[in-house]
Amino acid sequence: MGELADPVVIGTITAPHGVRGTVRVRPAGEGRHLREGLSPLVGGRRRRILRARRTPKGFLVDLEGVPDRFRAAELRGEDLLLDRSELDAPEEDEFYVADLVGLEAVDERGGALGEVIETFPTPAHEVLVVRGEGGLLYVPFTREHVPEVDPRAGRAVVRPPEE
C-alpha cells in the first residue's frame, strides 16, 4: 500500500458501469468519503474522484485516469483506500467499520465472547466475525445485536443471534 501509513478501505469497485470509465463502488460504511476531490489509492496509485453519486446499488464513481470501460473493468475488486489521517473525524457515537476489528466482544453481563477478527458487508448491514472458544460467531452489526460499541475501551457488547 506504499504511501499510506494507516490505510482504511472506503469502498470496493464491484463493476464497470457504462462505456466512459465509470465504476460501481460498494461503500465501506455509509460512503461519506466517496466524494469529489478526494484521491484514494486505487490499484496501486492515487486517483482523484472526479464525480460520485449514490444509487440504490451503491455509488457510481468517475476516477481520474480511467477513461473507458476496459480500464474500469481492470479495477474490478480493487479497494479504494485513504490514510486514516485523511478521513473526516467521526461524529460523536460514530466510528469507522475498520475500528471494529480487534475489539473484544462481550455479552451483556460482560462475559468474554471473543475478538472481532473481521467485518464484511451484506445488502442489509455489516456483519461482525467474532472468534471465540466455540469457533466463529457471525453477528449482524445492528443496534439489536450490537447495542454498545466503545472503541476507546476496546470492546463491543454483543447479543448473538438465536440459532
Curated annotation (Swiss-Prot):
All residue ranges annotated as the PRC barrel domain in the record: 92-162
Subcellular location(s) per record: Cytoplasm
Pfam families linked: PRC_RimM, RimM
Main location: cytoplasm
Keyword Transport found: no
GO molecular function annotations of the record: ribosome binding
Annotated GO CC locations: cytoplasm; ribosome
GO annotation terms (biological process): ribosomal small subunit biogenesis; rRNA processing
Superkingdom to which the source organism belongs: Bacteria
Keywords from the UniProt entry: Chaperone, Cytoplasm, Ribosome biogenesis, rRNA processing
NCBIfam families linked: 16S_RimM
Function in brief: An accessory protein needed during the final step in the assembly of 30S ribosomal subunit, possibly for assembly of the head region. Essential for efficient processing of 16S rRNA. May be needed both before and after RbfA during the maturation of 16S rRNA. It has affinity for free ribosomal 30S subunits but not for 70S ribosomes.
Subunit composition and interactions: Binds ribosomal protein uS19.
UniProt family annotation: Belongs to the RimM family.
Entry text on domains: The PRC barrel domain binds ribosomal protein uS19.
Protein name (Swiss-Prot/TrEMBL): Ribosome maturation factor RimM
